[in-house]
Amino acid sequence: MKRLFAFVVLFLTLLAGPALAQQCLHGTNESAEQAARKRDALTATRTINNIQANQPGAAKGQYFRQEELAGAPFAARLRESPSETVRRISLNPGTDILPNWKLTLDVTRTGYWFMIKDTSDPCGFAYISNQAGVIFQGEPIR
């Protein structure tokens, strides 16, 4: 009886395993819609770096905090952009930078770093960058 019970538990575990596996939105099986969302988020990532690099304080290593981005001179021109993606970017505190993409920005004495994370992706895909302007893509180790 113990052997049968162990077999049933093992069998059910093997059946449930794939059902419990996370379906990542970005990766080898990424849909065209998710790839487009990811491109839009990359545009937003580049936009944050441009706002930070093209403001007067950048030469002295002074950068905008997240709550200051919406008031940046470069940010004021986003709504006039020919790019629909750029026009959809929201820099208002407490809002998604793009639908289901969250901006986290931290300014230090010597620079800044930020992450734009896909909040709809169970695997946590994100773009990460800093004052050097290099953009990384990442997700948590699984």
Label every model-predicted segment:
Residues M1-L4:
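Positively charged n-region of N-terminal signal peptides that target proteins for export
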Residues A6-A16:
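Bacterial N-terminal signal peptides
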Residues Q34-T45:
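Membrane-proximal amphipathic alpha-helices
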